[in-house]
Every structure is written in C-alpha cells, then in structure tokens.
Curated annotation (Swiss-Prot):
GO terms for cellular component: chromatin; cytoplasm; cytosol; nucleoplasm; nucleus; receptor complex; RNA polymerase II transcription regulator complex. It comes from Homo sapiens. Residues 1-37, 65-88, 180-202 are annotated as: Disordered. This is Oxysterols receptor LXR-alpha. GO terms for molecular function: cholesterol binding; chromatin DNA binding; DNA binding; DNA-binding transcription activator activity, RNA polymerase II-specific; DNA-binding transcription factor activity, RNA polymerase II-specific; nuclear receptor activity; RNA polymerase II cis-regulatory region sequence-specific DNA binding; sterol response element binding. Residues 95-170 bind DNA. The gene is NR1H3.
Length: 447
C-alpha cells in the first residue's frame, strides 16, 4: 500500500484528514455535503438553449427608399452659400505654407494654419510648461532651418501667429474625451431598436449536470477547508525564541512548514476523492495524478490566502508569512519570489470558490502526468471540467472575453513553478534537511 495514501501525521488524531483512503471516508464526505448551501441557484433558473455560442452570419441589406422625381420649380431659387460651422478649419489640400516656419502646412492647428512639426512643438511646449532661452537676443528669423536651432523664438512665433494654449488638451483630457465619446456611441447603439434580420442572442448557460457538479465541488472544498483548518492548529508552532538564528529555531520553522504541507496534501487527497470520475480511475492512475499535481494545487490554495496589502500569506488564523519568513524556514529566493508573484497575479483575477474549485479539478485531471495509464479517460474527465468552467465564466464575466484564457494560462504558469519546486527540494537535500516520509514519497525524494 502506498505510504502517502495512509501515512499518519504526528499530533493529529486518527479521525482527521490523515485517514485518506478508508472505505467509509467517501460516504462520510458525501453525507457532509447534503446540507451545504447552494450558491448557484440563480443560474439554474436561466433560460436554456441548445447551443453554447451563437454563430454570426451576414445581415440582410435594409430596404432602400425610392427616390421620387422632383417637380421643376415655378420660380428661380436663390442659392445662398452655407456658413461654415465653428471649429477648426478643414485640412488643407493645396500648397499652403505654415504661418510659423514656412514649411508646407497640413491644416489649422490650435487656430493657426501650420505644419505638423510646429503643431507638435507647440503642444509639447504647452504640456511641459517649457521655458526656452534664445542665445541671439530673441530676434531669430524663423524658417525650416532656424526652427530647430532656437526654440524660444519658435514658440514666440507660434503665439504671434495666433496659436492658443487653451486649445491644447492634456493626455488626461484626451483620454476622458475619448472615453466619453465611446460611452456616447455605446449608449446610442443600445438605444437603437434591434434589426429584424439580427439573429436572437443565445445566452450562455450551465446544464443541470454542470450546475450539480459545481455545487458538489464547492461543498467538498468547503468541507475539506474546515477539516484541514482544525489540523493546522496542531502543527509545530512558529518559534518565538530570543535567538531567531539558533539551530533550534531554524529546525522548528522547517518543521512548521513541512507539517503545514502535510495537512495541505491531506486536504488535496480528500478533495480529489470527491471529484466526479476520480474514484472510477484505477488506483495507480489516482496515485500518479495526485503525486504530480499536489504541488500545483498547493500553490493554487496558497494564492487564495495572499494578502496584497501586506504582501503576505495567511495559513493560520491571525498569523501571516512574508517572504522573509519563508526564507527563514529554509526556502530559496528562487522559489519564494515566484510563489508571491503567482499569488499576486491570481489575486488580481478575483476568482470565487467555484472558479478555484474548477481550476483545481482541471489541474488534477492532466493526462500528460508521468505514469498515467488511461490517458484517454483522464482527458475526457478534464474536458468535462474545462467545459463547465467555460460556461461558468461566460455567465459571471460576460464582458471579459479574456477571463477564461487568462485562467487557463495560470495552469501553464503552475507547470513552471512545479519545476522550480523540484529544484528547491533538491536544494533542501543539500542542506541536510530531511523531509517527512509522506512528502518524500510525493516528491520522489530518495534518501
């Protein structure tokens, strides 16, 4: 029997998460879920449709109104020139010259006929509040050559020609103006009645099977978290010795972290046993999947406990760990920094319990793990969870089309972190830090 599927943990009673594979463990877990609250009832009432996403087709051309022939006027009509609207003049099409330097003008800029060069120069000068100094007394003749030599005279000529500083918009004003225009266009688009030729929009939806699966995952995760929390309270306490650099303090910190890791592994095994389809796999494939995915799931769970304000991670109530604490426990900076960077990136996504549970399930059901025999079945199971996550994200993030691919890319980042973790384990061996038997078997550390 594999050691890590039933290894006892010091100071943790037999009825805790250590008894990972007793026959009655699964039934007890199922009964515990019966009274869990459903957080997804609202989606269940959403209208169903046969497809997932609507195909976009060509819209039919709108009917064109017939033009009636105009009757000839009985009296001659007086033709009056139209008055030009207020605002900047249209772009020049001839050979007009810049009023500042004499170069070819491109249009009216800031109320003056000017070239692109003088337009940009005036804008930069106003935004920066620049003050230039002329070394020739301030009387330089301005042309295409001198405009590069004397900035003070060029700016003075811009103002003399009539360029107005109040016409220059700052970057923030331009951004707000663009944003306002986009909002107006969007409001106008939503106010238009739908065209008869437009296909009806098919809303994303969760099937009853997907809804039930997500509810089960969330309930299982909450149950495992409650159980592991009580186990975490029994680990070796963090040392508060007067000499934090003493050998005893270092050993105590290392034991503290390794025991936390053991509890996390137990939580992962408990959760995996409640994943639909997991127990139908062979025992060998169950072990292969859990051994290689354990560190990735641990890092996902770690990211949930990340506090961006203090840049710390809370494993125990009212006790947070920063980068320095990880280093004091014997971990290398090359492993610590990626952990915190990954946790920060995950925190920015603001995932909820259902999204985390689905990501963990997708990570566990990876058919490319070493020693997996029935890869086809594992792929099918993973595809089920990927489809459920896609449907769930489409409902909860309808305006963020990149949310789903961003979440899957985090699983790619976890693979990189997993290889860094292997190097960390090797470094611990070089430091003569002996891992507990359970962790040694999971991470294939052979003494």
């Amino acid at each position: 029997m594999s050691l890590w599927l039933g290894a006892p943990v010091p100071d943790i009673p037999p009825d805790s998460a250590v008894e990972l594979w007793k026959p009655g463990a699964q039934d007890a877990s199922s009964q515990a879920q019966g009274g869990s609250s459903c957080i997804l009832r609202e989606e269940a009432r959403m209208p169903h449709s046969a497809g997932g996403t609507a195909g976009v087709g060509l819209e039919a051309a709108e009917p064109t109104a017939l033009l009636t022939r105009a009757e000839p006027p009985s009296e001659p009509t007086e033709i009056r020139p139209q008055k030009r609207k207020k605002g900047p003049a249209p772009k020049m099409l001839g050979n007009e010259l810049c009023s500042v330097c004499g170069d070819k003008a491109s249009g009216f800029h800031y109320n003056v006929l000017s070239c692109e060069g003088c337009k940009g120069f005036f804008r930069r000068s106003v935004i920066k509040g620049a003050h230039y100094i002329c070394h020739s007394g301030g009387h330089c003749p301005m042309d295409t050559y001198m405009r590069r030599k004397c900035q003070e005279c060029r700016l003075r000529k811009c103002r003399q020609a009539g360029m107005r500083e109040e016409c220059v918009l700052s970057e923030e004003q331009i951004r707000l103006k663009k944003l306002k225009r986009q909002e107006e266009e969007q409001a106008h688009a939503t106010s238009l009645p739908p065209r008869a030729s437009s296909p009806p929009q098919i809303l994303p939806q969760l099937s009853p099977e997907q809804l039930g699966m997500i509810e089960k995952l969330v309930a299982a995760q909450q149950q495992c978290n409650r159980r592991s929390f009580s186990d975490r309270l029994r680990v070796t306490p963090w040392p508060m010795a007067p000499d934090p650099h003493s050998r005893e303090a270092r050993q105590q910190r290392f034991a503290h972290f390794t025991e936390l890791a053991i509890v996390s592994v137990q939580e992962i095994v408990d959760f995996a046993k409640q994943l639909p389809g997991f127990l139908q796999l062979s025992r060998e494939d169950q072990i292969a999947l859990l051994k290689t995915s354990a560190i990735e799931v641990m890092l996902l769970e770690t990211s949930r406990r990340y506090n961006p304000g203090s840049e710390s991670i809370t494993f125990l109530k009212d006790f947070s760990y920063n980068r320095e604490d990880f280093a004091k426990a014997g971990l290398q900076v090359e492993f610590i920094n990626p952990i915190f960077e990954f946790s920060r990136a995950m925190n920015e996504l603001q995932l909820n319990d259902a999204e985390f549970a689905l990501l963990i399930a997708i990570s566990i059901f990876s058919a490319d793990r070493p020693n997996v025999q029935d890869q086809l079945q594992v792929e099918r199971l993973q595809h089920t969870y990927v489809e459920a996550l896609h449907a769930y994200v489409s409902i909860h993030h309808p305006h963020d089309r990149l949310m789903f691919p961003r979440m899957l890319m985090k699983l790619v980042s976890l693979r990189t972190l997993s290889s860094v973790h292997s190097e960390q384990v090797f470094a611990l061996r070089l430091q003569d830090k002996k891992l507990p038997p359970l962790l040694s078997e999971i991470w294939d550390v052979h003494e």
